[in-house]
Swiss-Prot record:
Source organism of this protein record: Streptomyces coelicolor (strain ATCC BAA-471 / A3(2) / M145)
GO BP term, example: electron transport chain
GO CC annotations on file: plasma membrane
Subcellular location: Cell membrane
UniProt catalytic activity: 4 Fe(II)-[cytochrome c] + O2 + 8 H(+)(in) = 4 Fe(III)-[cytochrome c] + 2 H2O + 4 H(+)(out)
Family: Belongs to the cytochrome c oxidase bacterial subunit CtaF family.
Transmembrane segments: 5-25, 33-53, 88-108, 110-127
Name used for this protein in its record: Probable cytochrome c oxidase polypeptide 4
Domain of life: Bacteria
Record's keyword terms, sorted: Cell membrane, Membrane, Translocase, Transmembrane, Transmembrane helix
Tagged with keyword Signal: no
Bilayer topology annotation: Multi-pass membrane protein
Amino acid sequence: MKIQGKMFIWLSVFILAVAVVYGYWSKEPAGTTALFLAFGLAIMIGFYLAFTARRVDAGAQDDMEADVADEAGEVGFFSPHSWQPLSLAVGGALAFLGIAVGWWVMYFSAPILMVGLFGWVFEYYRGENRTQ
């Protein structure tokens, strides 16, 4: 976390310099305000990471001699045979198409979205994949 903290603190210094130069040259308040807010966000994240790095044990990312495998852990669980993400993607595509074409397309996309969402959530609670 020390490296990430330093990275965000240096990023905030750069954003502050850009905000000052942009504000001086452009005289435009919206962009200048956005850059100063980005500076504030970066400095808050940087100091949070720096202070948190003091309280927790050093991770593999802080060791210069570390390998990639030192930080490796369980990635997570996924089901490669599932059709539910496809139905969710089709429902989402139809929903966004409904924004462009007409809101009436949402009537067709909402049931597909619900089937995909509930099917994906409850996939391992029914049928042959039931774990309990």
